[in-house]
Amino acid sequence: MQVKNTEELRRELIELLSEMDVVQRGKFILSSGRESDYYVDIKRAVTEPAVLDVIARLIADAAGEVDRIAGPALGAVPIATAVSLYSRKPLLMIRKEKKGYGTSKLIEGDLQKGDRVAVVEDVTTTGGSLLKAVRAIQENGGIVEKAFVIVDREEGAVDEFKREGITLIPLLSVSDFNHS
């Protein structure tokens, strides 16, 4: 089996996502509340094993020395699961808010104080949703130095993370799809 380098994997991911028409044109409301003339519909793509395989390899190779892989619900959970399986690092799932029943946990999984955590997300615009997950990890004793996103919309998330002292690493940016 041929080992692919990072650039080959990136090209493969662009091709897979382009074939699935993940960038849709029209009028959309984003999770940030903003209007947009395009939408990055990655949810369907991350249900495909071939897509998850490429994503997991790219993130696991770039994550370096971490103790846990985390993903905010719902969109990032399949991504975090794939990276966890590929890297053999335990998984954390971050809820949007605490449950009002059962254990009332915000974080599912075994997060220990001082654990180094790589956080993954499907799409970022401003980075607000992902930063909320990062803060939940930090408030529970985890250390986040790197976060990964499959597609960055290039609307400020990378800079916002930089201000927080965290490196946000987009696997792809929306400009990678502008030819479509």
Swiss-Prot record:
EC number(s) from the headed UniProt entry: 2.4.2.10
InterPro entries (UniProt xref): OPRT, Or_phspho_trans_dom, PRibTrfase_dom, PRTase-like
Cofactor: Mg(2+)
Keywords for the protein's UniProt record, in alphabetical order: Glycosyltransferase, Magnesium, Pyrimidine biosynthesis, Transferase
GO biological-process terms attached to the record: 'de novo' UMP biosynthetic process; pyrimidine nucleobase biosynthetic process
Keyword Transmembrane helix: no
Keyword Magnesium: yes
Catalysis performed (reactions): orotidine 5'-phosphate + diphosphate = orotate + 5-phospho-alpha-D-ribose 1-diphosphate
Binding of orotate, residues: 125, 153
Binding site for 5-phospho-alpha-D-ribose 1-diphosphate: 95-96, 99, 121-129
Pathway recorded for this protein: Pyrimidine metabolism; UMP biosynthesis via de novo pathway; UMP from orotate: step 1/2
Sample GO molecular function, one term: magnesium ion binding
Subunit record text: Homodimer.
Family to which the UniProt record says this protein belongs: Belongs to the purine/pyrimidine phosphoribosyltransferase family. PyrE subfamily.
NCBIfam families the record matches: pyrE
HAMAP family recorded: PyrE
Protein role: Catalyzes the transfer of a ribosyl phosphate group from 5-phosphoribose 1-diphosphate to orotate, leading to the formation of orotidine monophosphate (OMP).
Protein name, UniProt field: Orotate phosphoribosyltransferase
